């Protein structure tokens, strides 16, 4: 997703979280450390 807001809108319903460089947010189980 382009923005974390867009990502969270989609990911929060699946109980996942958003990680990634700005402009390329991904929906993941957990952020890599």
UniProtKB/Swiss-Prot annotation:
Modified residues (6'-bromotryptophan): 1
Domain of life per record: Eukaryota
Residue positions where 4-hydroxyproline is found in the record: 21-22
GO cellular component: extracellular region
GO molecular function, one term: toxin activity
Signal peptide start-end: none
Coiled-coil features, chain-numbered ranges: none
Disulfide partners: 7-19, 11-27, 18-31
Keyword Secreted: yes
Tissue expression pattern: Expressed by the venom duct.
Modified residue annotations for 4-carboxyglutamate: 6, 8-9, 29
Keywords tagged on the record: Bromination, Disulfide bond, Gamma-carboxyglutamic acid, Hydroxylation, Knottin, Neurotoxin, Secreted, Toxin
Main localization (coarse): secreted
UniProt KW Secreted keyword: yes
Subcellular location: Secreted
Comment text on domains: The presence of a 'disulfide through disulfide knot' structurally defines this protein as a knottin. The cysteine framework is VI/VII (C-C-CC-C-C).
Function summary: Induces sleep-like symptoms in mice of all ages.
This protein's name: Bromosleeper peptide
Organism: Conus radiatus (Rayed cone)
